[in-house]
């Protein structure tokens, strides 16, 4: 009985205490309007939250198009254990069934969370065990600032500034600035001030976490990203020629800085009529900024940085931390650029005065900095021969220009250690006449304007076929379709003058295999239309059939294919052959406004002098493999190296031809526009070798780009002039790796008039070069001039021997001057010997005994024998006589030339005369 009142007292105290505690606890959960910013905290924050909590909040925006942003206080403490017991979760909607944006616990505050719609669901749960301080977050409407700061710029010049400049910029901004230029206008952007929040622990440039500025070559997130910038380092000057340059500015809710200010202006581009792709790209001049140069490593003392790798720099050069062929120097050109040549130097240490240089290197290129291709020579990686001392400049010219953005030089051998300075040569695609990018890369062409015959899946849709910027590419439904069955089409929006396409393979995606990631098109055709219904193919002017264009050899490296201008609004590309991985393609169309096009003469070949030229275009590892519909039949189109045809119109410009500098120190071919009152071709400049009768005389060599004609011979034409009596000689030699062959020679005064020379360049399995060699003997006055060297497609081969006297082989050859001392100084070791020529013994001064067989004409003998003795007996006798005649004393007279030119074949007793190539003499029978 006594315990009963005591029990009631305890119960009363318990419930009264519980009531007091409940009155002290803040409300847990609710529905909150984010029109006015507010805070949500765990119960009791910053003290330990209670156990057995289950709080739910719904935060909503007043407008359906508004978003909500949550920012957490860094003081965050919720029991760990993988968030099984205590946790806070945020869902992108108004209930527990909405998409989960995050589930958090532990001691690290969650990052900023932004809703996709106008509602967020927040839930906090705790169990009976240990507790912590909990959380505190701020909710508010997510303000992008787009209405205030996003803007398009179309005026010729202007200023772009961060919102509020020069005051600190606001939080939570996402602004877009777009500069739009008219055709043939270049956009130049230069920053005046730059100060954005950055991470103190930032590893490298572009590693921006909080506030940043992205610059795009085109529409944001469509065109290629040029760079991401933050901190206080001012970006260097940018030059864009695609017609659109965009900036996207992002800020978070924390620290704000002063922002940026930049000036832009538009510059009119007018390409020269005789466009040459050989300009220095800016390593020496500084146009390539320091931030664009990087390396695999740098020597530890900090005196041999990548930024010291500029050609002719006076402060050391670049040296890696360890001398290894795995090290590389990298240059980011920022935009797609035609690379035509590379010049290298070593360096002399300012500390030790020792010379270091690279003796050989490999070249790697990429359009995105991720997928790299090693430049190849056939199936093997091309190894460029570089320097022989620390100061010498050596130029390596690429056989075919490469379209790329990122370039790596990877040293292979070196002297004492790796030290490198360099310059890059080339041009932009848009530098050529009527070669504007019409919008695939920049995004000016919308996704709806790109279509295809079929597509594999969303990631490989036609809209993914944008050059470079796409993360994948177009892939048809059937990876091994019939040739010409599949196509990719671009609607340009309005009629344009179309002059070419840039084709690129497809990049790998998450849903494909490694094999499929290397898909590219090897050969293709192009058709065009003004209305989308009536289509015409680009024609081969020689065959009047649809032209079969060469495609890619690597899935990342783009290739330009040009053709005669055509009016078109719709362009289709038909893959004809492709890699084993199937059809994969990215594309850009080149051209200009319909009224802008005009006939021009353009040459994409480099005109810089070089020490070495590379051999055929680089090939991928899979280049020798082919799908079931792909064959290795050689293209019948003549593919001459860029710069072979040359009229030398501009001083110091020799197209793809080069001087032999090792023998050019005593005299130089000079460009002249003063013909001394004598006729010369079309009143143009030309090359001239001249001597005034001095003791040393003159000797010069002019060397062509590499030529590869494995299937059919062609006719080379040129104009020449030779004055100076018997002391003047001009000859043309074919030089291959293991042999040289004399093709054409004159050694007498030709008068003051210009004359035409024509030579058949025979088919040859190996790559070779054509060399013009001119000699004016010691003590002789004379002049040799050359102009307008070109391959002619309208001259029949039977008419391609001019003058005939230049092909006679009984004119003596020079062997280091032997037997010709009175006419040409033997100091000129012109290597006029011909290892493949018919003879070398028969010269007038040799005193060799003449024979009656030496004077016989084998043609006459053959005709008489076959007419007199009948077909069978005549053939037998003719064979014996030919053998005796040709083999006696090497037969270096006109008789051998006659036999070289003709071959007799018997068909049913009839005699047929057939022209053959001038490659082998009859003495080889």
Curated annotation (Swiss-Prot):
Membrane topology: Single-pass type I membrane protein
Ranges of biased composition (kind: Low complexity): 835-846
Tissue: Found in certain neuronal populations of the CNS, including dorsal root ganglia, and in other non-neuronal tissues including mesenchymal tissue lining in the ribs.
Residue span(s) of domain F5/8 type C: 277-427, 434-592
Transmembrane segment boundaries: 859-883
Highest taxon above the source species: Eukaryota
Disordered: region residues: 297-317, 601-621, 820-849
Extracellular side: 23-858
GO biological process, alphabetically ordered: angiogenesis; axon extension involved in axon guidance; axon guidance; cellular response to leukemia inhibitory factor; dorsal root ganglion morphogenesis; facial nerve structural organization; facioacoustic ganglion development; gonadotrophin-releasing hormone neuronal migration to the hypothalamus
Residues annotated to bind Ca(2+): 197, 211, 252
CUB domain sequence ranges: 28-142, 149-267
SS bond list: 28-55, 83-105, 149-175, 208-230, 277-427, 434-592
MAM domain location: 642-802
Glycan attachment points: 152, 157, 629, 833-834
Chief location category: membrane
CC terms in the record's Gene Ontology section: axon; glutamatergic synapse; plasma membrane; postsynaptic membrane
CDD domains documented for this protein: CUB, FA58C, MAM
Protein localization: Membrane
Parts of the chain on the Cytoplasmic side: 884-925
Purpose of the protein: High affinity receptor for semaphorins 3C, 3F, VEGF-165 and VEGF-145 isoforms of VEGF, and the PLGF-2 isoform of PGF.
Similarity remark: Belongs to the neuropilin family.
Domain remarks in the Swiss-Prot or TrEMBL record: The tandem CUB domains mediate binding to semaphorin, while the tandem F5/8 domains are responsible for heparin and VEGF binding.
UniProt name for this protein: Neuropilin-2
Taxonomic source organism: Rattus norvegicus
């Amino acid at each position: 009985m006594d315990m009963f009142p005591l029990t009631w007292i305890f119960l009363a105290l318990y419930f009264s205490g519980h009531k007091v505690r409940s009155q002290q606890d803040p409300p847990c959960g609710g529905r909150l309007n984010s029109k006015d910013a507010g805070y949500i905290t765990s119960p009791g924050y910053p003290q330990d939250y209670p156990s057995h909590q289950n709080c739910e909040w719904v935060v909503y925006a007043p407008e359906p198009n508004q978003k909500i942003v949550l920012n957490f206080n860094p003081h965050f403490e919720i029991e760990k254990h993988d968030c099984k017991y205590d946790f806070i979760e945020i869902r992108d909607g108004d209930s527990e069934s909405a998409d989960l944006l995050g589930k958090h616990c532990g001691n690290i505050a969650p990052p900023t969370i932004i809703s996709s719609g106008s509602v967020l669901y927040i839930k906090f749960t705790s169990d009976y065990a240990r507790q912590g301080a909990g959380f505190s977050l701020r909710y508010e409407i997510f303000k992008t600032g787009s209405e205030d700061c996003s803007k398009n710029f179309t005026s010729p010049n202007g200023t772009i500034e961060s919102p509020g400049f020069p005051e600190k910029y606001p939080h939570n901004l996402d602004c877009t600035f777009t500069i739009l230029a008219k055709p043939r206008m270049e956009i130049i952007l230069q920053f005046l001030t730059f100060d954005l929040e950055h991470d103190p622990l930032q590893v490298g440039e572009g590693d921006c976490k909080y506030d940043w500025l992205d610059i795009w070559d085109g529409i944001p997130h469509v065109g290629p990203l040029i760079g991401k910038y933050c901190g206080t380092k001012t970006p260097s000057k940018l030059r864009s020629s695609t017609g659109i340059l965009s900036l996207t500015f992002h800020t978070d809710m924390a620290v704000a800085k002063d922002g940026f200010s930049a000036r832009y202006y538009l510059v009119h581009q007018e390409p020269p009529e005789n466009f040459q792709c050989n300009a220095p790209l800016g390593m020496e001049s500084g146009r390539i900024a320091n931030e664009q140069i990087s390396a695999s490593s740098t020597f530890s003392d900090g005196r041999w940085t990548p930024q010291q790798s500029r050609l002719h720099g006076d402060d050391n050069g670049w040296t890696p931390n360890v001398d290894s062929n795995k090290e590389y120097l990298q240059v980011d050109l920022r935009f797609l650029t035609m690379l035509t040549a590379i010049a290298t130097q070593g360096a002399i240490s300012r500390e030790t005065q020792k010379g270091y240089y690279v003796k050989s290197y490999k070249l790697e290129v990429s359009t995105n900095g991720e997928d790299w291709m090693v430049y190849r020579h056939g199936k093997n990686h091309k190894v460029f021969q570089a320097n022989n001392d620390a100061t010498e400049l050596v130029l390596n010219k690429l056989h075919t220009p490469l379209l790329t953005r990122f370039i790596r030089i990877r040293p292979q051998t070196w002297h004492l250690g790796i030290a490198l300075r360099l310059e890059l040569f080339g041009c932009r695609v848009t530098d050529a006449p009527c070669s504007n990018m019409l919008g695939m890369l920049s995004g000016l062409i919308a996704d709806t304007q790109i279509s295809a015959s079929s597509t594999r899946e969303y990631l490989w849709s036609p809209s993914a076929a944008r050059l470079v910027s796409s993360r994948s590419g177009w892939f048809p439904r059937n990876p091994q379709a019939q040739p010409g069955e599949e196509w990719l089409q671009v609607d340009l929006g309005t009629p344009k003058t179309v002059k070419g396409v840039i084709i690129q393979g497809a990049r790998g995606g998450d849903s494909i295999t490694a094999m499929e990631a290397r898909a590219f098109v090897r050969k293709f055709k192009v058709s065009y239309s003004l209305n989308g219904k009536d289509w015409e193919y680009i024609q081969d002017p020689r065959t009047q059939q649809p032209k079969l264009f060469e495609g890619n050899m690597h899935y990342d490296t783009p290739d330009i294919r040009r053709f005669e201008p055509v009016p078109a609004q719709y362009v289709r590309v038909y893959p004809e052959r492709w890699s084993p991985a199937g059809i994969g393609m990215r594309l850009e169309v080149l051209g200009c406004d319909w009224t802008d096009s005009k006939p021009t003469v353009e040459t994409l070949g480099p005109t810089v002098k070089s020490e070495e030229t590379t051999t055929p275009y680089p090939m991928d590892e899979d280049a020798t493999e082919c799908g079931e519909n792909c064959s290795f039949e050689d293209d019948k189109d003549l593919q001459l190296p860029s710069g072979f045809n040359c009229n030398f119109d501009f001083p110091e410009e020799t197209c793809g031809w080069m001087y032999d500098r090792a023998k050019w120190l005593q005299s130089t071919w000079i460009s002249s526009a003063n013909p001394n009152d004598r006729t010369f071709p079309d009143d143009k400049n030309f090359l001239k070798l001249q001597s005034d009768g001095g003791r040393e005389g003159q000797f010069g060599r002019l060397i062509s780009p590499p030529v590869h004609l494995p299937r059919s011979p062609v006719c080379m034409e040129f104009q020449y002039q030779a004055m100076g009596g018997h002391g003047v000689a001009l000859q043309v030699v074919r030089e291959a790796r293991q042999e040289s062959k004399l093709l054409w020679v004159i050694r007498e005064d030709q008068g003051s008039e210009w004359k035409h020379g024509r030579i058949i360049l025979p088919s040859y399995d190996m790559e070779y070069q054509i060399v013009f060699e001119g000699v004016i003997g010691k003590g002789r006055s004379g002049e040799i001039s050359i102009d307008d060297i070109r391959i002619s497609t309208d001259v029949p081969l039977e008419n391609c021997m001019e003058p005939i006297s230049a092909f006679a082989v009984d004119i003596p050859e020079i062997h280091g001057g032997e037997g010709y001392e009175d006419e040409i100084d033997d100091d000129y070791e012109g290597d006029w010997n011909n290892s493949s020529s018919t003879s070398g013994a028969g010269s007038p001064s040799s005193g060799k005994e003449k024979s009656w067989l030496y004077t016989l004409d084998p043609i006459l003998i053959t005709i008489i024998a076959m007419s007199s003795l009948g077909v069978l007996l005549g053939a037998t006798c003719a064979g014996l006589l030919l053998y005796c005649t040709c083999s006696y004393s090497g037969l270096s007279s006109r008789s051998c030339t006659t036999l070289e030119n003709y071959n007799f074949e018997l068909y049913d007793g009839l005699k047929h005369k057939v022209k053959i190539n001038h490659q082998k003499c009859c003495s080889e029978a």
